[in-house]
């Protein structure tokens, strides 16, 4: 599929998703409207409810952000550029739309026959602007792209950045190690892990040393958090089905 077509499809998907979220702009994401119109987004919500809204560093203050370092940096920098809630949302939404187009193009490079499918995914329309996860998805897809072309060092660098943006890409590491194992490339696996870990550490260490409590908050929250909206576990809990050690169970099922 031609690059122009991929870009058009991705742009249309991002525009439709923006229209889906746009009712909230009119009433400034007030409750219950943001839930009635299904346009809730972390973008404006966290600006007002976290320290970045008062100009503080993302991982300092009484209310640090519940995101890894790179996402927190994006949240902080965009807050410096746009202090008003609507402007902050629009700025971040524009960046996310560009990232989505980039992700669609990378997907097409990895599997050309599937290049258009991403833009027609209902989940994209429903949740494109709900948070900053596309920053991690973009670098994750770059990592997959380089790995597919056997550029393992670049892939490891990209996945290290991705994990420092959102932790879920860490689950690609066992897949990569298995591929190295299948190809009897132990040295390659060790090098891949070393570059990934070194990249993640280089990004995280300055923040962990200077604002340790704020840095740890993301990990602490996800270890302790209960079933949240939008999850199967929340639906089960609403039906009276409680599950102990839910976070550990989720990790095991994902693996």
Could you say what each language-model-derived stretch is?
Residues 1-144, 180-255:
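Primarily membrane-embedded glycan-assembly and transfer machineries that use lipid-linked glycans
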């Amino acid at each position: 599929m031609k690059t122009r077509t991929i870009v058009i499809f991705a742009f249309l998907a991002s525009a439709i998703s923006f229209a889906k979220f746009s009712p909230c702009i009119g009433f400034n994401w007030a409750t219950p409207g943001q839930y009635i119109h299904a346009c809730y987004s972390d973008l404006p919500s966290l600006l007002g409810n976290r320290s970045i809204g008062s100009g503080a560093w993302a991982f300092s203050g009484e209310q640090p952000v519940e995101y890894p370092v790179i996402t927190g940096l994006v949240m902080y920098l965009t807050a410096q550029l746009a202090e008003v809630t609507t402007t902050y949302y629009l700025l971040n939404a524009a960046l996310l739309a560009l990232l989505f187009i980039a992700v669609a193009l990378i997907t097409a490079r990895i599997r050309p026959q599937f290049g258009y499918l991403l833009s027609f995914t209902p989940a994209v329309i429903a949740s494109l602007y709900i948070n900053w996860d596309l920053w991690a998805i973009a670098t994750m897809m770059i990592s997959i792209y380089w790995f597919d072309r056997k550029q393992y060092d670049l892939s490891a660098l990209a996945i290290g950045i991705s994990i420092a943006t959102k932790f879920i890409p860490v689950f690609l590491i066992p897949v990569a190690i298995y591929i190295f194992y299948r190809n009897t490339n132990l040295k390659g696996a060790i090098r891949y892990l070393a570059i990934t870990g070194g990249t993640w550490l280089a990004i995280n260490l300055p923040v962990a040393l200077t604002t340790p409590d704020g840095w740890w908050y993301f990990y602490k929250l996800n270890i302790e958090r209960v079933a949240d909206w939008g999850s199967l576990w929340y639906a089960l809990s609403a039906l009276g089905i409680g599950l102990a050690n839910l976070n550990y169970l989720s990790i095991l099922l994902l693996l």
